[in-house]
């Protein structure tokens, strides 16, 4: 589990290197918020500072795998640049307000992450399935 946290993921090259090693070892991984940005950087993607951060409990996100929309809680000021995807990452979720990346999965690896906060309570519970998927992958 790569937890959330404050700040610019580019200031954490040590974390990016650690995640590269974990992904290379085929370890199972679930990233949340900052963890999503670090996983993206570990796959060669870049992040950027949002003009206006995503803050609050009513951000609509589309799951591109299922086609369903989810209401999410968010609190981040950086985003993943989809133009820097070298093909190693599948973009799984996008923000319906501004089309920013909200979820990724590393192709061929048991590693995925979301930019928002599925653990947030009180708040929307549309994304609780992510924890079920991660726990199931551990079995």
Name what the model sees in each region.
Residues 1:
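N-terminal Rossmann-like NAD(P) cofactor-binding module of classical short-chain dehydrogenase/reductase
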Residues 7, 77, 118-119:
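Short, glycine-/Ser/Thr-/acidic-enriched flexible segments
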Residues 56, 100, 120:
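Flexible, glycine-rich phosphate/dinucleotide-binding loops
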Residues 67-109, 138:
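Catalytic beta-strand/loop cores that center a nucleophilic Ser/Cys/Thr
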Residues 104-139:
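A glycine-centered loop/beta-turn motif at secondary-structure junctions
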């Amino acid at each position: 589990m790569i937890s959330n946290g404050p700040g610019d993921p580019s200031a954490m090259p040590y974390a990016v290197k650690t995640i590269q090693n974990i992904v290379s070892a085929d370890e199972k991984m679930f990233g949340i918020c900052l963890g999503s940005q670090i996983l993206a950087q570990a796959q060669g993607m870049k992040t950027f500072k949002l003009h206006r951060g995503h803050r609050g409990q009513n951000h609509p996100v589309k799951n591109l795998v299922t086609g369903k929309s989810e209401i999410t809680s968010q609190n981040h000021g950086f985003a993943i640049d989809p133009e820097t995807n070298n093909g190693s990452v599948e973009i799984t979720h996008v923000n319906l307000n501004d089309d920013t990346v909200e979820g990724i999965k590393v192709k061929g690896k048991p590693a995925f992450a979301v930019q928002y906060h599925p653990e947030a309570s009180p708040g929307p519970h549309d994304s609780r399935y992510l924890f079920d998927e991660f726990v199931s992958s551990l079995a």
